[in-house]
Amino acid sequence: MKKIILATLAWTLMSAAQADNHSEPNYSKFQSNYYFSCPQPAACVGAFNQLMASPEIADKNFEVTLYALGHNGWDESTHMVSFYFKTAERYLEAGQTFSASPAFQEFTKAGASVGVENKAQTLTTHSIVSGDGRGTRSMVTWTVNVSDPATFVPAWQKLSKALENYPWASKAYGLQTLLLGNQGWATHQIWTAFDSPVEALNFLEKFYLTPEFQAYSAEVDGAVSLVRSYIANTVYEANPD
């Protein structure tokens, strides 16, 4: 498990560009994430598409992605919706908009009718981001519990930087801090973005075999532990930034 965690750190820090203007990615400050199970995926995707197309919501241009989850080793969640906010005020606006939306009420009814079950909610904030994830369709995520940030973060950054020259590196990565919803079992999430599941699997096959990862594993031993991991494939996206 530690190997997976360490590996995720390595590949994440491969592209070094900060968002200074709109020609570069404008990453969110806060991410509101909702995990759920859906036994009828086509119905759930259709209902979500209809919700986001409703006038009172579409006019707000909220940045949101609906993901299908694979190989989730933690619970029975099959999908995740992530809303991305640049400011706390935008987060508040979204809450007010959805709570007053008739379309959202219809969406919840539609979900209940096909057996949707809510599994978890988290609020995260980006601590580190790098690269350009716009247009990517697959994301590998590791949820981790960091007991020694002073050891973990520099080691992760060193590993990721060292892996930049590998041809199978991710297009972008981020380290998120869990603000709410962690239930005491995790402190951070690491994500890496790829153009396709094929690229994601190619990365997973190779990154933990590198000498850089082996050195990283030894360095962070006892400082971080893996909670869960999964691959998230985009099935709906609105207003990417």
For each of these PLM feature ranges, what is it?
Residues 4-13:
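Sec-dependent N-terminal signal peptides
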Residues 13-19:
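Sec/Tat signal peptide C-region and signal peptidase I cleavage site
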